[in-house]
A protein has these predicted regions:
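Long alpha-helical repeat solenoid scaffolds
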Residues: 1-231
Length: 231
């Protein structure tokens, strides 16, 4: 999406003096960036590509910018995951899995999503609207882990189309073995992360049930006390 690429590059150039300058530039143009991102998945992916291309010498700055764009909902977690594990990994035939900033981008995005879910599930009591929001966020978190699983499984097994097309002989070249190993490592990390979050949900549900029971018992005790006073 050429227009999105040009616009994002201009915003980044205006704020190129420092991280604080670029974050201020994003703050001033967040409405227009939101409109650009809302156009399509391709536009959101282009925002990520433009950001990483402009700050290629300092990927840490690019990651901070992407985090800010996630906070403003200009980007979605799904877009970040697809860009990193499907588009970027595909364009590099899996070699992006060995890049530190790509891993950090995915991990930070997952932690942002799971952190939001944890904040919601530990609340002792929720209204109907908040309960609906909590259930929606849990569903979105599980969908995100499923997308990560789908993307990484094919890299880990060597069945990704890009690997098959580039395969030499039996697909046992050093590069292909390396990609499979990285895919397997990524898969272990995020499967473990998914299991941890599911365990947290179970414990949070138990805690909510315990508190609800305590409140119910407290209410019954209070009613009994008032009844005795009336007598």
């Amino acid at each position: 999406v050429a227009s999105t690429d040009v616009f994002v590059t201009c915003v980044l150039h205006v704020g190129s003096k420092s991280l604080s300058h670029v974050l201020a530039a994003i703050e001033r143009t967040k409405d227009r960036l939101a409109d650009a991102g809302a156009a399509s998945d391709a536009a959101r992916s282009q925002i990520i590509s433009a950001t990483l291309a402009y700050w290629s010498a300092h990927p840490g700055v690019a990651l901070s910018i992407i985090e800010k764009l996630l906070n403003y909902s200009i980007l979605t977690p799904e877009t970040v995951i697809n860009w990193a594990l499907v588009a970027r990994a595909g364009n590099t035939r899996g070699e992006a899995l060995a890049t530190a900033y790509v891993y950090e981008m995915v991990f930070n995005t997952v932690m942002k999503v799971t952190g939001r879910v944890r904040q919601l599930v530990v609340k002792p009591s929720l209204g109907a609207e908040e309960t609906e929001t909590r259930d929606r966020e849990i569903k979105a978190m599980r969908a995100l882990f499923a997308a990560i699983e789908d993307a990484l499984a094919s890299w880990a097994t060597g069945s990704k189309d890009e690997m098959i097309e580039a395969s030499e002989g039996e697909g046992n070249s050093e590069g292909e073995r390396m990609v499979r190993r990285w895919g397997q490592r990524w898969l272990r990390v995020f499967r473990r992360r998914a299991a941890i979050e599911e365990a947290f949900l179970v414990e949070a549900e138990k805690e909510r049930a315990r508190r609800a029971e305590e409140q119910a018992q407290g209410g019954e005790t209070e009613v009994e006390g008032l009844t005795q006073m009336d007598v």
